[in-house]
């Protein structure tokens, strides 16, 4: 089984956006989540113990030659408990912000799948946390230094594979929380003479599941 989250052509409204699923190794595909022709998938995470449980972040985003739209009614956080056959939208009743949302970054703890993080672009960019598998959410950090003022550009998160409280904020620079997102410290960086030619921005992170010091 393969899942692909597609943003589609960012310059046009089109039907190629959304979440797709293949059950035959990629030979055939079925779209299983879609909101509108301006919204695609910004992030997707799977419960490491229960692969039928998925969290998907839809993101309304459209480019123009000199600008872009980030956010709208097509954005949102969705939960499936049956491998994407049906979805429920997570919203205000579960603790998320009111109004239109933008880009959402997700991370689920391998050591405790009940711990899920979501960094959400809204009127005020906020870091949310769920400790019950996505049933309810609370704001864990509202400091703009870490929730950032460019959520359309930096919005990814990563969780230590053995410690649910160690959360990495993939930004500029990379920062790390040791208390489940409440506070962040700059992550020790590679010496400057070893990073020549490497751009300062961070957009993705892989953590070794057997050795979380290796990333």
Predicted segments with their positions:
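Beta-propeller blade termini and top-face loops
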Residues: 1-215
């Amino acid at each position: 089984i393969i899942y692909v989250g597609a943003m589609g052509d960012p310059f046009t409204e089109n039907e190629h956006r959304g979440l797709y699923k293949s059950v035959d190794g990629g030979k055939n595909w079925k779209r299983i989540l879609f909101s509108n022709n301006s919204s695609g998938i910004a992030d997707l995470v799977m419960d490491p113990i229960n692969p039928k449980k998925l969290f998907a972040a839809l993101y309304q985003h459209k480019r123009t030659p000199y600008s872009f739209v980030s956010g709208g009614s097509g954005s949102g956080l969705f939960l499936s408990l049956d491998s994407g056959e049906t979805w429920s939208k997570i919203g205000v009743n579960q603790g998320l912000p009111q109004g239109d949302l933008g880009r959402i970054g997700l991370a689920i703890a391998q050591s405790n799948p009940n711990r899920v993080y979501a960094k959400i672009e809204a009127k005020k960019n906020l870091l949310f946390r769920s400790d019950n598998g996505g049933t309810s959410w609370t704001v864990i950090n509202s400091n703009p230094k870490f929730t950032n003022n460019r959520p359309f550009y930096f919005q990814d998160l990563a969780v230590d594979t053995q410690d649910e409280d160690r959360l990495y904020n993939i930004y500029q620079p990379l920062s790390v929380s040791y208390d489940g997102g409440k506070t962040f410290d700059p992550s020790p960086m590679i010496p400057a003479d070893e990073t020549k030619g490497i751009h300062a921005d961070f957009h993705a992170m892989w953590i070794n599941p057997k050795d979380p010091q290796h990333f």
